[in-house]
Amino acid sequence: MAENLKRLVSNEALRTLQEKLDSWLKEYNTNTCDQNLNHCLELIEQVAKVQGQLFGILTTAAQEGGHNDGVETIKSRLLPWLEASFTAASMGKPVDSKVPSLQNTFDRERRKDPSPRDRDMQQLDSNLNSTRSQLNQVQDDLAETEKNLEETKNRSAISLLAAEEEINQLKKQLKTLQAQEDARHRHTDQRSSENRRSEPRSSEERRCEQWSSLKRNADQRDTEVTSDYKKQLRNLKEEIAVLSAEKSALQGRSSRSRSPSPAPRSRSCSRSRSASPSTAVKVRSPSPNRSKLSNVARKAALLSRFSDSYSQARLDAQCLLRRCIDKAETVQRIIYIATVEAFHVAKMAFRHFKIRVRKSLTPSYVGSNDFENAVSDYVICHLDLYDSQSSVNDVIRAMNVNPKISFPPVVDFCLLSDFIQEICCIAFAMQALEPPLDIAYGADGEVFNDCKYRRSYDSDFTAPLVLYHVWPALMENDCVIMKGEAVTRRGAFWNSVRSLSRCRSRSLSPICPRSQIGLSTMSRSRSPSPIRCGLPRF
C-alpha cells in the first residue's frame, strides 16, 4: 500500500487538478458551452483516475486488516457515502450529509421488526434452555436414586452380615451343647461300669434299666434341643436367602440405571457351561439363595421378564429385522414363530434336564420319600446349568425349515440370537414353577378370543378371525396370566388356507435344495406333516 500511496503523491495529480480548476474559473465566462463541458469532463476523468487509485489503496488496506478489522469503518462511512452519492447523482441534487442512509434505514427496520430467522433463533434458544434445565433435573434425580439404591444395598449387606454372624453363633452353641452331651454320656457310661463292678449281680440289672431310662431321657432332650436349633438355623437361612435375593435385585436395578442401553445378558456366560447334573452334584452344592425363594417371587420375576421381552426385546428384534425386510407382517410372523419355537425347545430341554437330575440323584436317595422334593430343589438351584446356546441353535434350525418364514430365505435368523436366548431362559425357568407356565396355542384363521389376545392397532376391529399372531398369550393351566396380541382381518381364514397351500408347494419343490435339507432335518426331529410344519408348534 505504501508504494501505491507514494506513486499517487509523486504524480501530483491533485495539484494539476487544482490548477485546472483555477484556469477554468477564469475562462468560464468567455468559453462556449462545449468548451466548459470539455473542461468539466477532463476534470471528471482526472478525478476518476485519482478515485480509482484511492479505491485500490482502500482495498489493499482492508486486505491487510484481515477478515474483521475495518468492517465497521466501511459500514459506517463508505456505504452511507456511496448511497448518498448515487441517490444525489440519480436525482440531480447535491450530496447532503443530513439525508438518512440506507444502512441506517435497514438497521431501524431490523430493530423494529425482527426477521423470522431471529424469532426462530430465539425460540431455539428458549427450547435449548428448557431442555438443559430438564436434563439437569433428570441428572439430579438419577444421582438421588443412585444414592438411595446405595443406602438400601448397604442396609441389606449389614442385615446379611448380622444374620450370618448369628448363624455362626448358633452353630458354635450347638457344637458346645453336643460336646457337653457327649461328655455327660461318657461320664454316665464310666459310672455305670464302675457300679456294675462293685455291686452284686442282682442289682446290676436294675442299674442297667435305670441307665437305659436315663439315656432315653437324655436322647429325647438332645433331640428336642437339636430340632429347635435346626429350626432356628432353617429360619435364618430363609431370611438370608430373601436378603440375598433383594440384594441381587437392587444390584441389577442399579446397574441398569447406570447403563444407557441394555447390554448382553450376563447369564449367557454361566448358561453356556455344561448342563450335566452328574458333574454338578460332585462339584457344586445346592445354593439356599435360589432354592428357598418362594414360588410366588420367582413367578413374579419371570412375569416381569416376559413383559419386558414383549415391550422392549421384541421391538429391538423388529428393528433388526426391518433393516432386511420391509414388510411388517413378515417381521411380526418371524418374531412370533421364534417365540413359539423357543418355548417348545426350552420345554424339551427342561424335560431332559430333569431326567438327568433324577438319574444322578437316584443313588443318594434310595428308599427316601423326599426324592421328588430333592429333584425340584436341585433343578431350582441349578437353573444356570441350562445350555441356552444349544437351544438357540435348535430354534434357528426349526425356523429355517418353517415354510411360512424361510421360503424364500430373506434374512439370517442368527440376528435374533439374543432375543431367542432370553425367551429360552424365561421358558426354561417357567417350567420349574408349580404349576408351570406355558404359552397358548394359536393358529392362523382361528376365531379371535378376547380373553387371550388384544387386537393390534392395524387390525380390523369388526373381523372375527385372526390373520396372524404378534405375541402369544401366557397360560397357567387353563387360566390366562398375560394376554397376547393378534391381527384380525376380514377373510383371514381363506388367506391362511392359501398361504398354507403355497407353503406346501414350496416346501416340497425339488428345485430348492434348502427345502430338501429342511425336510430331512425335520423328519429326524419332528413329525413331517405339512400342516404341523406350516402352523406354530408347542
From Swiss-Prot:
Q: Which GO terms describe its cellular component?
A: cytosol; intracellular membrane-bounded organelle; mitochondrial matrix; mitochondrial outer membrane; mitochondrion
Name the Gene Ontology molecular function terms of this record: cardiolipin binding
Polar residues: compositionally biased ranges:
123-137
Give positions of region: Interaction with YWHAG/14-3-3 protein gamma: 1-273
**Keyword Mitochondrion assigned:** yes
Renumbered to this chain, the Basic and acidic residues biased-composition regions fall at 106-122, 181-209, 216-227
Q: Which residues carry this modification: Phosphoserine?
A: S85, S156, S159, S285, S287, S509
- Subunit and interaction comment: Interacts (via coiled-coil domains) with BNIP3L (via BH3 domain). Interacts (via coiled-coil domains) with BNIP3 (via BH3 domain). Interacts with YWHAG/14-3-3 protein gamma; a protein that also plays a role in MALM.
What is the purpose of this protein? Key regulator of mitochondrial quality that mediates the repairing or degradation of unhealthy mitochondria in response to mitochondrial damage. Mediator of mitochondrial protein catabolic process (also named MALM) by mediating the degradation of damaged proteins inside mitochondria by promoting the accumulation in the mitochondrial matrix of hydrolases that are characteristic of the lysosomal lumen.
The similarity comment for this entry is: Belongs to the MIEAP family.
- The molecule here is called Mitochondria-eating protein
Originating organism? Macaca fascicularis (Crab-eating macaque)
